[in-house]
UniProtKB/Swiss-Prot annotation:
Encoded in the Rac prophage region. One of its GO terms (biological process) is negative regulation of DNA-templated transcription initiation. It comes from Escherichia coli (strain K12). This is DNA-binding transcriptional repressor RacR. Disruption phenotype: Deletion of the gene is lethal, except when the adjacent ydaS gene and the common intergenic region between racR and ydaS are also deleted, or when both ydaS and ydaT genes are also deleted. Down-regulation of the gene leads to up-regulation of the adjacent ydaS-ydaT operon. RacR silencing causes striking morphological changes in cells, significant growth arrest and cell death. RacR silencing does not affect biofilm formation.
């Protein structure tokens, strides 16, 4: 992992690439995304220091324009939750993501961005398909929740 001035340069380069890609318009917009004031972004660049808790979001936010090697990493670290089941699930998801094609990764990045940035390949068909998927998954999850609740109902009283 880069640190100091090298990290500052890497942050500045990533911001410039993000602006050049058209997904953000300014450093101020980047600051808003990270819920910090614009001077903080300038400090990140100048001093190369950023709060460790912001690193995963930094990597995620710029993942459409730079990879882990840009930050001096071989791969992005996997979050380590306390629950071992969740950890195993995250490892599985990460392995699937790493094995996915560039096209699948681009789709995942777009979906996880919350439609904050819209690549050129996104058109009304893609938006309609995503809306339909979200609606179907919503119905599916509600049905699962309803089924789970009905199985947990126990008879009480006399």
């Amino acid at each position: 992992m880069l640190s100091g001035k090298d990290l500052g340069r890497a942050i500045e380069q990533a911001i410039n690439k993000k602006i050049a890609s058209g997904s953000v318009k300014s450093k101020a917009e980047v600051a808003r995304h990270f819920k910090v004031q614009p001077p903080s972004i300038y400090d990140w660049i100048k001093k190369g220091s950023i709060s460790k808790d912001k690193l995963p979001e930094l990597w995620r936010f710029f993942s459409d324009v730079v990879g882990p090697e840009h930050w001096g990493l071989n791969e992005y670290p996997i979050p380590t939750p306390t629950n071992s089941d969740t950890k195993s699930e995250l490892l599985d998801i990460n392995n699937l993501y790493q094995a996915a094609s560039d096209e699948i990764r681009a789709i995942v990045a777009f979906l996880l961005s919350g439609n904050a940035t819209e690549p050129d390949w996104v058109d009304h068909d893609v938006r309609a398909y995503i809306a339909a998927m979200e609606m179907k998954v919503g119905k599916y999850l509600k049905a699962l929740e309803s089924e789970r609740k009905s199985q947990n109902i126990t008879k009480t009283g006399t």
